[in-house]
């Protein structure tokens, strides 16, 4: 099977062109290729497929084999793949995901995609639709106790569930210990992605993420979008927000007129190869 390893600010996936390759068991393949010792090494697997409703379909799986609804960094890499490989010559494309159809604008230099702006759609704030079990209709700056420590969380869905927690120090935070406790907390029926965020100023945030099914990753595009929405809802930020992640920076804008969130960031090919299955 031929594959391409790609990354969006360090959030790395193995990409398979399903116009040419056939994948029988994507969940098992995701677990195998994601293993950084016995496989290729990645945060998961993304299959690029035909679509009846859009230009392409993105089918994503986490490192543990669970299927994900949407990946912001991954969808930018899909856009780069299909353009750079000649599957399209359009600089405005649509990609179908389990979280709906996303629309992307490609910035091309010397025939290659260098930057992608994604319309990530509308944030979902209604608790039962995220889903979060809560007493209130929305979960904004609500208290939560994890392992004897009190936090405040804001919950947002960007097609997948996110819990955003603002704190003073994210660099020294024990995410390997606390991340799984948030992910599997009883009030999150489909588990949850958790962002731990420091406010630098009204235009800038620093973020670490514990991804459902993958653990800590270098970046999470949907998480950055959820974080930007949470920052605005909590009065920390407004307008276009620059978010510093472990792997690099993303620009996020929540357009209040359309209620759509836009994400801009890079995408890169790491290497290509062939693997015997």
Where on the chain are the PLM-derived regions?
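Active-site-proximal beta-strand elements of phosphoester/diester hydrolases
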Residues: 117, 152-155
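Active-site glycine-rich loop that binds ribose-phosphate moieties when present
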Residues: 124-152
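A glycine-rich beta-to-alpha transition motif near the start of alpha/beta enzyme domains, typified by
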Residues: 1-112, 163-277
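Membrane helix-loop-helix hairpins that form the core translocation module of multi-pass transporters
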Residues: 115-123
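Generic structural detector for well-ordered beta-strands
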Residues: 105, 119, 131, 143-145, ...
């Amino acid at each position: 099977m031929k594959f391409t390893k790609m990354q969006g600010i360090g959030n790395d996936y193995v990409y398979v062109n399903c116009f040419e390759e056939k994948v029988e068991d994507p969940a098992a393949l995701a677990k195998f290729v994601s293993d950084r010792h016995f496989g290729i090494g990645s945060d998961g697997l993304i299959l690029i497929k035909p679509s009846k409703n859009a230009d392409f379909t993105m089918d994503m799986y986490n490192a543990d084999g669970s299927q994900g609804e949407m990946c912001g960094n991954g969808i930018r890499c899909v856009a780069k793949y299909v353009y750079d490989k000649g599957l399209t010559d359009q600089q405005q494309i649509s990609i179908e995901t389990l979280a709906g159809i996303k629309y992307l604008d490609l910035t091309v230099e010397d025939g290659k995609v260098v930057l992608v702006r994604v319309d990530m759609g509308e944030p979902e704030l209604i608790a039962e639709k995220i889903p979060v079990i809560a007493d209130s209709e929305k979960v904004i700056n609500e208290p939560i106790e994890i392992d004897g420590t009190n936090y405040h969380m804001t919950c947002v869905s960007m097609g997948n569930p996110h819990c955003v927690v603002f704190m003073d120090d994210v660099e020294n935070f024990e995410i390997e210990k606390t991340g799984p406790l948030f992910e599997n907390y009883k009030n999150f029926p489909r588990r949850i992605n958790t962002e731990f965020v420091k406010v630098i100023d009204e235009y800038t945030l620093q973020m670490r993420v514990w991804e459902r099914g993958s653990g800590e990753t270098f970046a999470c595009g949907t998480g950055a979008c959820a974080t930007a929405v949470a920052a605005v809802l909590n009065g920390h930020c407004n307008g276009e927000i620059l978010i510093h992640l472990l792997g690099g920076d993303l620009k996020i804008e929540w357009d209040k007129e359309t209620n759509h969130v836009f994400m801009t960031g890079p995408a890169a090919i790491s290497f290509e190869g062939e693997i015997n299955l």
